[in-house]
Regions:
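N-terminal membrane topogenic signal
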Residues: 1-18
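Hydrophobic alpha-helical transmembrane segments of multi-pass inner membrane proteins, especially
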Residues: 15-172
Length: 172
């Protein structure tokens, strides 16, 4: 599950810049509203833990789980539209987990990119087959529709552009 870690390959400059910008952001938010500062610090701690785990994880393992990942994303997107979803300013885009608030459409951007990379690469030899085109369009359309129902037009457009780019690169 975890790959052999080599510190010399780690982009330390990038990590330092991210922490520097995050610290500046926390200080600016803290000067405007103290109550938000603790939430931002919690986000920094949780984000750092996630960064460490993800940087040590071999992403090829995720590629073997691409169907469960797709199903999980659909489940989260459906949960947003149920009473578990939290509405803010007329948009129901979040799931309130009490400790943090999760926005599944943001996670969907990354996971759908991984899903379609694996899905399309597995079908390289029949990429121009009409059945492959229809299945790909349906698999894209379901989460896109759910995200559009939240409503989150910018995320829908983003994943549509990524999907169209992937389709173009594969040679449809």
């Amino acid at each position: 599950m975890f790959k052999q870690y080599q510190f010399r390959n780690y982009r330390l400059k990038l990590v330092i810049l991210v922490y520097l910008l995050t610290t500046i952001g926390i200080l600016v938010i803290g000067s405007a509203e103290k109550s938000f500062q603790s939430q931002q610090i919690l986000g920094l701690v949780l984000g750092s833990a996630a960064m460490l785990v993800l940087s040590l994880t071999d992403y090829n393992i995720l590629m073997h789980l691409y169907w469960p990942i797709y199903g999980g994303i659909l489940l989260l997107l459906i949960l947003v539209l149920t009473p578990l979803g939290k509405e803010v300013n007329g948009a129901q885009r979040w799931i309130d987990l009490k400790v943090i608030t999760l926005q599944p459409s943001e996670l969907a951007k990354i996971m759908l990119t991984l899903f379609f990379a694996k899905f399309l690469s597995d079908r390289q030899d029949r990429i121009n087959d009409i059945f492959t085109v229809i299945v790909s369009a349906v698999l894209f359309g379901i989460p896109a529709f759910l995200i559009l129902k939240e409503p989150d037009l910018s995320t829908t457009i983003t994943i549509a552009l990524v999907f169209c780019s992937m389709i173009f690169v594969t040679g449809f």
